[in-house]
Structures are given as structure tokens and as C-alpha cells.
């Protein structure tokens, strides 16, 4: 695990109950404030509030962010593997990676991905929901295809596109993390992290992969600085914060940027 890296703050802009112009303005302001990573989510309907309220699609939005932004890394937290074929996902990610390069050395896209869970998306858009196990099996298979396709595309990605995987299930999810993830979004408490590290390391031995560069991520929702400090002490280095409009609370962002800066001082 990579513990000697700066703390970064990621903000997940929730693409619901706002107009796209509001999202565009939030992206601009968050980058200007110094946020490190911007995320959206990959759903087709709001997750809370009015279930039929305004909502926007993830990947189209990410391509717009690639062109709009100059510095931040960005991606979905997380992509739903079920909604697009693996090879198409790879090509979309590679294309957005190139769009975001904009004169820099590399692109800034993070390929955050997961197996999917929101059944309404599946039912209304015509995807087979299957079971949690079948969706995880598909994710494992499709990630192999994504990586293989990245090796075939012309032009190739501008860098090894970082793969971010969330979850904590020890039999399937953490094996996928050990095989593919550059960033693990952990969803666990500080006390649980050492055990989960051990599970990932055992799977890494099975997969023959060195995880010394794995970055650990966690969320700040309903947590204070005391919990964030404990997560930091346990090895977390990317902290994510949900952000919803239309009444964006930028004071919350300022608070956590101050905390981040104190850790990096």
C-alpha cells in the first residue's frame, strides 16, 4: 500500500436535481478551490429525492469535464460495468484520457468501475440484473478485457490509466482489487482496514501482483476530522466527499481542504 503519498481530496458531484449549467459551474469552482479529484456517478435516475427528478448520464459528462478542466483528475465513482461492453469502456476511457491531456504530459482520467447495484437502471434500460455474484464475475472478466484492449488501441492511452475499484467483499471484490486496482475505495472503518489489507495482500500473492503502489480511498460522509485522522493513520490517502446541488455548500469543501492541507504540511 502506498502510504508515503500526499493526502488528496476528491469531490463527487451528484448529477441529480440540477441543470447541467449548475454542474459546469460547480466543476469550475471546485477546480479553482484546489480540489484534487472530481467524480460523478454512473446511474440513469436520481438515487434520492424525487426519483423522476433531473439527472444526467455519466460518461458524456466526463468527456465534457476532460475539455473543461485543466488540472484535476476525474472519473466516475463508479462506472457500472453492466451498461457498456468492456472493449467500448476501454476505448471511451482512452479517448477521454487523450481529451484531458491538453498539452500536459498525460491525461487525467481515472477509470473507477464496479459491478452495479441500482436495479431501476437495469430494468428501465433493458439490462439483465442477474445476481450480485454474477455481476462481480462479469466485472472480473471484463476488466481483463479492458486492460487487454488498452494494449491494442491506436493511439494507446497517454499513461497507465489508474483503475479504481470500490468494495470490501473478501471472496470476490478484494480479489478483483488485488488483480487490477491502483486505487481501492474501501468503505470500511479505520479498525477494519488492517484486516482488509491482509486479505488483499493474500489475493495479491495469488495473482502475482505487487501492491506497493495501491492507494487507499475512503469517504467522508457523516464523518468528522477525528474519524478522518484515524483513517489517515490507518493508511487512507484519498478522501471523497459527496456534493449535491442546487444549493452547493462550498464551506464544506473549504473545511476539508483545510484538513487536507494540514496533513500535507
Task: List PLM regions with ranges.
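Active-site-adjacent structural elements that line small-molecule/cofactor binding pockets in enzymes
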Residues: 1-265
